[in-house]
Curated annotation (Swiss-Prot):
Enzyme Commission number(s) from the entry: 5.4.2.12
Gene giving rise to this polypeptide: gpmI
Note accompanying the cofactor annotation: Binds 2 manganese ions per subunit.
Cofactor: Mn(2+)
UniProt organism field: Synechococcus elongatus (strain ATCC 33912 / PCC 7942 / FACHB-805)
Residues annotated for Mn(2+) 2 binding in this entry: D15, S65, D439, H440
Assembly and binders: Monomer.
Descriptive protein name: 2,3-bisphosphoglycerate-independent phosphoglycerate mutase
Binding site for substrate: H126, R156, D157, R188, R194, R258, P259, D260, R261, K331
HAMAP family named in the record: GpmI
Entry superkingdom: Bacteria
SUPFAM superfamilies, per the entry: 2,3-Bisphosphoglycerate-independent phosphoglycerate mutase, substrate-binding domain, Alkaline phosphatase-like
Protein residues bound to Mn(2+) 1: D398, H402, H457
Functional summary from the UniProt entry: Catalyzes the interconversion of 2-phosphoglycerate and 3-phosphoglycerate.
């Protein structure tokens, strides 16, 4: 029989599983979810905040997976890069940023071109048009006239055809700054892959590096023609609009602030031993990234990472306890790199297992994704009886929800619900406790008030459930565990530390979701059994 000290606390992150009462357009309410429904009714449950100022974003800004996992792991509200960079644009300090000035200096030295690459979107998840506006003002202030914009269209964190409005906004930014020209346009499907689908990235890279006269159309015309074919912004074919390829001596600023979908294209430009596809390394090239995409990349970084200390994984490791993280490819960086505050290397005693995501064009074609295998990995880790903390992410609600396909998203939700039943049974067998939550909303809002597909995240609250185990009980509580009703993601790490009996460090400013006990234990509590 396993010792009680190694009955685990298991954090289950249902990525994109938001709460919304209305059934219309709600894949979660439409789906059959007997396990989640039973857990919600049988165990202490509440709703928590995952957006805006509650996670370090501007008020009203939807959350995302990176932000969510940062807050989950840090146990404090983490000021996000979106806010940091927007502040720099608004207070003018972006005009004095050393890394950005380095790119401008190289362009002046070589009499060359400045290229601005990034997601042209107001979604605020990977980039923001306000930041592009700041870069155009910087170029103008530095006297650089040859400024070429390589626009990556969104359609995933925004409405599927919002790109045409974003192009109009860029044209206004260009007019205001007096410099800049959109020379290429490309959907994020190609330029921002993160699953090593190098055939996609190669198309984007070749668009940026092989010159030509262009297609004779404006960006707006290309998008309108794309929409007429029933294709959204995410899948816009890489298209050259005008001359202006990246060449030796040029300067490049990649203005995405979120690393995970900017890495692969960056590797193609800067790695000498790049193996994704054949290409000649462009040298010299001053390539600046807005944030640190990879600690091993030797490139100037405009906004260096924040140093987060005494985060959850670190505290667990410092007390000599072992932990396990697992997710499929699409969310693996989130339960590792982002959950650990932007640190790539695991902490001592932290084991990880990556489950490959299915190789399909879009996940509506495989809505089950790799949820079964992720569940198997988590159960195997729990059964070992050596881990005090297990963190698991189910990608399906978010990744399939992003496709805008209702039927597929319902299947994704039902798949996760079945897996959750198996997982909770394993946790109960081990005497552990499960904390079930989500990092942001998505699948609960599949189309807008006009009946158009909604493929972005939401600002809706998400569930939080404590499935208390037989050997991970909280001392001082009776038959019920009272939960706070004003919680946020940063409160979950302190809750985990309380369950593990570990002290909360002063840097961790979140508050446990569990209200102080009002009475003494009067009877035993046995986990409620749910069907699997």
């Amino acid at each position: 029989m396993l010792d009680a000290s190694i009955s685990p606390v298991v954090l289950v992150i249902l990525d994109g599983w938001g709460y919304r009462n209305a059934t219309e357009g709600n894949a979660i309410r439409t789906a059959e979810t007997p396990i989640m429904d039973a857990l919600w009714e049988a165990y202490p449950s509440t709703l928590i905040h995952t957006s805006g100022k509650d996670v370090g974003l501007p008020d009203g800004q939807m959350g995302n997976s990176e932000v969510g996992h940062l807050n989950l792991g840090a146990g404090r509200i983490v000021p996000q890069e979106l806010v940091r960079i927007t502040d720099a644009v608004e207070d003018g300090s972006i005009l004095e940023n050393p890394a950005l000035l380095q790119a401008c200096s190289a362009v002046r030295q070589h009499g060359s071109k400045l290229h601005l690459i990034g997601l042209c979107s107001d979604g605020g998840v990977h980039a923001h048009l306000d930041h592009l506006g700041g870069l155009l003002k910087l170029a103008a202030a530095q006297g650089i006239q040859d400024v070429y914009i390589h626009a990556i269209t969104d359609g995933r964190d925004t409405n599927p055809t919002e790109g045409v409005n974003c192009i109009t906004k860029i044209e206004r930014l260009i007019a205001t700054a007096g410099v800049g020209q959109i020379v290429t346009i490309c959907g994020r499907y190609f330029a921002m892959d993160r699953d090593r689908r190098w055939d996609r990235v190669r198309k984007a890279y070749e668009l940026l590096t092989i010159d030509g006269e262009g297609c004779g159309q404006t960006a707006t015309e290309v998008l309108q023609e794309t929409y007429a074919k029933g294709v959204s912004d995410e899948f816009v074919e890489p298209t050259r609009l005008a001359p202006g390829a990246i060449a030796p001596g040029d300067g490049v600023i990649f203005f995405n602030f979120r690393p995970d979908r900017a890495r692969q294209l960056t590797y193609a430009f800067v790695e000498a031993e790049f193996e994704g596809f054949e290409r000649d390394l462009i040298q010299p090239l001053t390539f600046v990234t807005f944030t640190q995409y990879d600690a091993n990349l030797n490139v100037p970084v405009a906004f260096e990472p924040q140093n987060l200390t005494n985060i959850l994984g670190e505290v667990v490791a410092n007390h000599g306890l072992r932990q396990f993280r697992t997710a499929e490819t699409e969310k693996y960086p989130h339960v590792t790199y982002f959950f650990n505050g932007g640190i790539e290397e695991p902490f001592p005693g932290e084991d990880r297992e990556l489950i490959p995501s299915p190789m399909v064009a879009t996940y509506d074609r495989a809505p089950k994704m790799s949820a079964q295998a992720v569940t198997d990995a988590a159960i195997a880790a729990i059964d070992k009886g050596i881990y005090s903390l297990v963190v698991i992410n189910y990608a399906n609600p978010d990744m399939v929800g992003h496709t805008g396909k209702m039927g597929a998203t319902v299947e994704a939700i039902e798949t996760v619900d079945r897996c959750l039943g198996r997982l909770v049974s394993a946790i109960n067998r081990a005497g552990g406790t499960a904390l079930i939550t989500a990092d942001h909303g998505n699948a609960e809002y599949m189309w807008d008030e006009n009946g158009e597909p909604w493929t972005a995240h939401t600002t809706n609250l998400v569930p939080f459930i404590v499935v208390e185990g037989e050997r991970r009980k909280l001392p001082g509580f009776g038959t019920e565990i009272p939960l706070r009703e004003d919680g946020r993601l940063s409160d979950i790490a302190p809750t985990i530390l309380q369950l593990l009996g570990l002290p909360q460090p002063v840097e961790m400013t979140g508050r446990s979701m569990i209200e102080p006990a009002a009475y003494e234990v009067k009877q035993g509590r046995t986990p409620v059994k749910v069907g699997v």
